């Protein structure tokens, strides 16, 4: 598959020229991490000052809810950590790190979710989410939706409310958005799974 299989979704909010520039920086790596997979590497976007600026602008312009509707941004490990804090700082919000199990000091609360072959868990520090806190979840990619759903359950278990999701990329055909309980979401670009 070539770059032409990438569909510009909410990225169009920054204009055609900037959208095409950002897409041109997304690298397709066939056979990684295993044969039959095409890995979409957006690290070149982060390394390019213009690309990073476009990415952050696009994520903010494509927010699925108004900034007045959330108090914090929760970034999912690990690539949600790359742009989530910058978004939070620019919008005057706090940042919550949703980590893989065992990566945070005690006390934490966690949530498990199913993988194709087994289970995984995500955690937050117990004081990261206070009762009533409204949270926007951000990540680089929505595929099956398992991690985003687990993060939602975790934040809500802690007393918060997830108000929406912001993704850089969406893999179509895996029904990941179906696991988001109908909450508002946005993705900048879409591509086939």
From Swiss-Prot:
Family matches, as HAMAP family: Aden_phosphoribosyltr
Localization per record: Cytoplasm
Protein name: Adenine phosphoribosyltransferase
Reaction catalysed by this enzyme: AMP + diphosphate = 5-phospho-alpha-D-ribose 1-diphosphate + adenine
GO terms under biological process: adenine salvage; AMP salvage; purine ribonucleoside salvage
Top-level taxon: Bacteria
Function comment: Catalyzes a salvage reaction resulting in the formation of AMP, that is energically less costly than de novo synthesis.
Complexes and interactors: Homodimer.
Enzyme class: transferase
GO MF assignments: adenine binding; adenine phosphoribosyltransferase activity; AMP binding
Keywords, alphabetical: Cytoplasm, Glycosyltransferase, Purine salvage, Transferase
Main location, first listed in the record: cytoplasm
EC number(s) on file: 2.4.2.7
Family to which this protein belongs: Belongs to the purine/pyrimidine phosphoribosyltransferase family.
GO cellular component terms listed in the entry, alphabetical order: cytoplasm
This protein's pathway: Purine metabolism; AMP biosynthesis via salvage pathway; AMP from adenine: step 1/1
Record-linked InterPro entries: Ade_phspho_trans (IPR005764), PRibTrfase_dom (IPR000836), PRTase-like (IPR029057), UPRTase/APRTase (IPR050054)
């Amino acid at each position: 598959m070539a770059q032409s299989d990438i569909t510009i979704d909410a990225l169009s909010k920054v204009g055609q020229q900037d959208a095409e520039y950002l897409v041109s920086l997304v690298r397709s790596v066939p056979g990684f991490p295993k044969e039959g997979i095409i890995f979409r590497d957006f690290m070149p976007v982060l390394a390019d000052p213009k690309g990073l600026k476009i990415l952050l602008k696009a994520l903010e312009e494509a927010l699925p809810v108004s900034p007045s509707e959330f108090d914090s941004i929760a970034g999912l490990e690990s690539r949600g950590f790359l742009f989530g804090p910058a978004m939070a700082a620019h919008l005057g919000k706090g940042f919550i790190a949703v980590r893989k199990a065992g990566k945070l000091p005690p006390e934490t609360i966690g949530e498990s979710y199913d993988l194709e072959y087994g289970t995984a868990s995500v955690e937050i520090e117990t004081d990261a989410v206070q009762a009533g806190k409204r949270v926007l979840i951000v990540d680089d990619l929505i595929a099956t939706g398992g991690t985003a759903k687990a993060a939602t359950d975790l934040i809500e278990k802690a007393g918060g409310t997830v108000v929406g999701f912001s993704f850089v990329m969406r893999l179509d055909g895996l029904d990941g958005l179906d696991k988001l309980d109908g909450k508002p979401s946005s993705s900048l670009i879409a591509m086939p799974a």
